[in-house]
């Protein structure tokens, strides 16, 4: 069962995913239906990420600005908001306040 604040009946990969010299750290959560999410934190910085699969980024806390590949406009997101990123693309993210996020791979 999943609630707004937790995921139940899941497995968690113990080894952390550490990117960009520790500016982005996450853990992978595996669900019984075969889907996966990562739960992570990004420290204030500016980064460029690449995606394989489409992603849904849900901001739990903090604040960021995002510019999707091919766009010239930045969008700002805060706690309770989310943004989607197409697969096989890139996006720029500027973290203004330490970002606590859930990333779903669609």
Curated annotation (Swiss-Prot):
Record-listed E.C. numbers: 2.4.2.1, 2.4.2.2
Recorded catalytic activity of this chain's protein: a purine D-ribonucleoside + phosphate = a purine nucleobase + alpha-D-ribose 1-phosphate; adenosine + phosphate = alpha-D-ribose 1-phosphate + adenine; cytidine + phosphate = cytosine + alpha-D-ribose 1-phosphate; guanosine + phosphate = alpha-D-ribose 1-phosphate + guanine
GO terms of molecular function: guanosine phosphorylase activity; purine-nucleoside phosphorylase activity; thymidine phosphorylase activity; uridine phosphorylase activity
Keywords recorded for this protein, A-Z: Glycosyltransferase, Transferase
Broad enzyme group: transferase
Pfam families reported for this sequence: Ppnp (PF06865)
Presence of the UniProt keyword Glycosyltransferase in the record: yes
Keyword Glycosyltransferase: yes
Annotated CDD domains: cupin_PpnP-like
InterPro entries: Ppnp, RmlC-like_jellyroll, RmlC_Cupin_sf
One GO CC annotation: cytosol
Function: Catalyzes the phosphorolysis of diverse nucleosides, yielding D-ribose 1-phosphate and the respective free bases. Can use uridine, adenosine, guanosine, cytidine, thymidine, inosine and xanthosine as substrates. Also catalyzes the reverse reactions.
Similarity comment: Belongs to the nucleoside phosphorylase PpnP family.
Protein name from the UniProt record: Pyrimidine/purine nucleoside phosphorylase
Organism, scientific name: Burkholderia cenocepacia (strain HI2424)
Top-level taxonomy: Bacteria, Pseudomonadati, Pseudomonadota, Betaproteobacteria, Burkholderiales
